[in-house]
Amino acid sequence: MALRFLGIDPNTGDQGSPTVWLDDETGDLVIQSYKADAATLAACAEVGSVPGHSTDVPEHETVVRLPGYMLQFFPKP
């Protein structure tokens, strides 16, 4: 895996904070951010996605909350 650092929360201290990397081999974004709280998970389940798709988050997935200002680090197509 060839990750390339894209950006970190500019207001970060020396503890964990939102960070974005790009996997140059797959084009995937790898994101470190805040765990979604129970209210956010419930809202995701209520809104859903496509008809008939489960609203449960499988064990191999998670939901994170990325602050909007971190979008500045996402590559433009």
PLM-predicted stretches and their roles:
Residues D14-D56:
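A short, structured beta-strand/loop element
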